A protein has these predicted regions:
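Active-site helix of classical SDR
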Residues: 107, 143, 151
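Short C-terminal tail/terminal secondary-structure segment
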Residues: 132, 209, 220-234
Length: 234
């Protein structure tokens, strides 16, 4: 059964892999992007998740073109790393606004239609860093940890309306965001991963597709780590 899916930040990296995976399963997938054209084979809508009006306009466009949004993957996010003592306040608040408050804006708008339909799938892309912490990433880690609390609160609040809310927590993924690591940092990273390799983006995408599927209808408030074991115990 084809569903209408919105993937925020779905024009590159993990988000693009998720969008392609869901489209391959027959869903009508719309990706948000901030500029340019959407990836080939996918529907696109311009949206900045830090702007409530833009989020509302994006949903209105999708609803008018494709129908009510049934599945949302809150993937859009940024990094602005820096040591705690040197991090300017706007580097902290900016990352929180995009990664955490942005997901809240999307969730609030998405659940209007989901509550009427008494069905919805909300999937938040967090990070192992949100569970373990990381030096130089206090802003990013806080934003990704916040998604867990958000998902579990939504799960409790809206579960009676047939809406599930779950989190996928990727570890180190082989994308352009990790391509700039130094050889030394990459060696350290590999040594910390029990499976001894980074993930491929499509491995994250398949986990998301499972949580979006009917097979996961009785799963809500869960955190699914896809991290090669690096975050085990958290």
């Amino acid at each position: 059964m084809s569903r209408v899916v919105l993937v925020t930040g779905g024009n590159r990296g993990i988000g693009l892999a998720i969008a392609k995976e869901l489209a391959s399963r027959g869903d009508t997938v719309v990706v948000t992007h901030r500029s340019g054209e959407p990836p080939e084979g996918l529907h696109g809508v311009i949206c900045d998740v830090t702007d409530s009006a833009a989020v509302d306009a994006a949903f209105s466009h999708v609803e008018s073109e494709h129908g009510p949004v049934e599945v949302v993957v809150a993937n859009a996010g940024i990094t602005q790393d820096g040591l705690l003592m040197r991090m300017p306040e706007d580097a902290f608040t900016g990352v929180l606004d995009a990664n955490l408050t942005g997901a809240w804006r999307v969730t609030q708008r998405a659940t209007r239609g989901m509550m009427k339909a008494r069905f919805g799938r909300l999937i938040y892309i967090s990070s192992v860093v949100g569970l373990t912490g990381a030096p130089g990433q206090v802003n990013y880690a806080a934003s990704k940890a916040g998604l867990v609390g958000m998902a579990r609160s939504v799960a409790r609040e809206l579960g009676g309306r047939g809406i599930t809310a779950n989190v996928v927590a990727p570890g180190y993924v082989d994308t352009d965001m990790t391509a700039d690591l130094t050889d030394k940092r990459r060696e350290e990273m590999m040594a910390a991963i029990p499976l001894g390799r980074t993930a491929q983006a499509d491995e994250i995408a398949k986990a998301v597709a499972f949580l979006a599927s009917d097979d996961a209808a009785y799963i809500t408030g869960a955190v699914l780590p896809v991290d090669g074991g690096v975050g085990m115990g958290h």
